[in-house]
């Protein structure tokens, strides 16, 4: 996984250990360096993610697109997955990603609707769901993907309701993993979810028609 556009985020989500503050200027050579790194490592699948860049008019979506194009130019047989922020719901920014044609467009819901305000700074469940639906309803030919972190205070039935929502908008891939607290300053772990519950999430999600679900304690959205 490559994280682009710096190491400083404009948001401060309760589960995340990325620095928050004023981000650096964009490095115009970074897309090429990412592409060269993919080439050097002979990757067959590359994941590109980023910090939130609410300081940029397009949220950094054009820079994302440039990186996708460079990776594909130097590595035509490599599939590209992007894990993107919500771009504040800006359809033009999302179009930049779609038009760059990644094989997988991933945007994480992270948690259930009730906990969104506590856990995801400046984001919302509805906006994220709309992003995924917009990609699916557009000319995007790749797969849509999202991830949930459990053990942060959600109830079993709330996760099932999210899976039902995702099935309604034809999301292709869902990951569900255990929350692990990065530091003592971050949101406490509410509980450790047992393996049987992860199995139930997978089984029920598949019964709703979701094609691919990875559900387990160590599952993470970026690989």
What are these regions (language model features)?
Residues 46-48, 80, 105-107, 174, ...:
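Hydrophobic residues within beta-strands of alpha/beta enzymes
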Residues 1-30:
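Canonical Radical SAM [4Fe-4S] cluster-binding loop centered on the CxxxCxxC motif
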Residues 20-47:
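Conserved alpha-helical substructure of the radical SAM core
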Residues 32-33, 39-42, 66-78, 92, ...:
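Auxiliary Fe-S-binding modules of radical SAM enzymes
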């Amino acid at each position: 996984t490559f994280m682009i556009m710096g190491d400083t985020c404009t948001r401060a989500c309760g589960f995340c250990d990325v620095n928050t503050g004023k981000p650096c200027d964009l490095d115009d050579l970074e897309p090429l360096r990412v592409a060269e790194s993919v080439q050097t490592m002979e990757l067959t699948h590359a994941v590109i993610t980023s910090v939130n860049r609410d300081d940029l008019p397009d949220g950094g979506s054009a820079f994302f697109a440039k990186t996708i194009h460079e990776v594909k130019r130097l590595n035509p047989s490599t599939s590209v997955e992007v894990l993107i922020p919500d771009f504040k719901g800006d359809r033009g920014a999302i179009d930049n990603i779609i038009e760059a044609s990644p094989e997988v467009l991933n945007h994480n819901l992270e948690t259930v609707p009730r906990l969104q305000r506590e856990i995801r700074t400046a984001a919302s469940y509805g906006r994220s769901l709309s992003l995924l639906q917009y990609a699916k309803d557009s000319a995007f030919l790749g797969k849509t993907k999202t991830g949930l972190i459990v053990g942060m205070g959600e109830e079993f039935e709330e996760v099932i309701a999210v899976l039902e929502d995702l099935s309604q908008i034809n999301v292709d891939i869902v990951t569900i993993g255990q929350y692990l607290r990065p530091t003592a300053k971050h949101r406490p772990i509410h509980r450790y979810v047992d393996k049987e519950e992860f199995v139930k999430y997978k089984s029920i999600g598949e019964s709703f028609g979701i094609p691919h679900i990875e559900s387990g304690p160590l599952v993470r959205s970026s690989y």
